[in-house]
């Protein structure tokens, strides 16, 4: 339970604690915005059609994965608004910008390398995997039972449960920042 002493005393304290503020937020003046549609116009946000967007704010009926509306940046600095699944990730890998539009193979190799390095430094992370999975990670492979998901967040690959990923139809980050299907 949170005590009152743990609650920030002012908005400025909250903003100091928040580290997940999107780049586009600097273009928004709250005094100029009266509703979300007006904000979208000022930001030049393109609304895009997403698979299962009708599940916004709901959970997938089979997997229980929640869908959330987000504004994301593509690899070219454009803003897109869509509805995306919020998978439980065991590990997030961050690609360098020059690999955003690389093939899946290049991206997954980079992610596997980051996972291997993170496990070497963090025994709590290692404890999430079986000995066989750790062996696969050590040899540079994606651990059995997991898939690298292209998050809607620019350059982020999430290590998620393969079965849940495969059963949760969605539009992923590969479409926006990863070069689309031609870069598979």
Each language-model region and where it sits:
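Nuclease and nuclease-like effector domains acting on nucleic acids or nucleotide cofactors
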Residues: 2-147, 152-184
């Amino acid at each position: 339970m949170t005590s009152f002493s743990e609650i920030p005393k002012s908005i400025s304290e909250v903003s100091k604690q928040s580290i997940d503020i999107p780049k586009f937020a600097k273009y928004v003046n709250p005094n100029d915005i009266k509703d979300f549609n007006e904000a979208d116009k000022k930001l030049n946000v393109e609304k895009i059609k997403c698979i299962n967007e009708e599940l916004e704010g709901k959970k997938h009926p089979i997997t229980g994965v929640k869908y959330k509306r987000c504004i994301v940046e593509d690899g070219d600095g454009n803003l897109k608004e869509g509805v995306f699944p919020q998978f439980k990730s065991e590990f997030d890998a961050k690609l360098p910008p020059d690999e955003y539009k690389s093939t899946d193979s290049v991206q997954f190799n980079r992610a596997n390398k980051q996972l291997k390095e993170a496990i070497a430094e963090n025994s709590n992370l290692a404890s999430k995997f079986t000995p066989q999975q750790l062996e696969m990670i050590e040899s540079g492979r994606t651990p059995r039972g997991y898939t690298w998901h292209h998050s809607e967040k620019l350059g982020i690959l999430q290590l998620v449960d393969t079965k849940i990923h495969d059963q949760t139809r969605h539009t992923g980050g590969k479409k926006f920042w990863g070069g689309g299907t031609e870069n598979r």
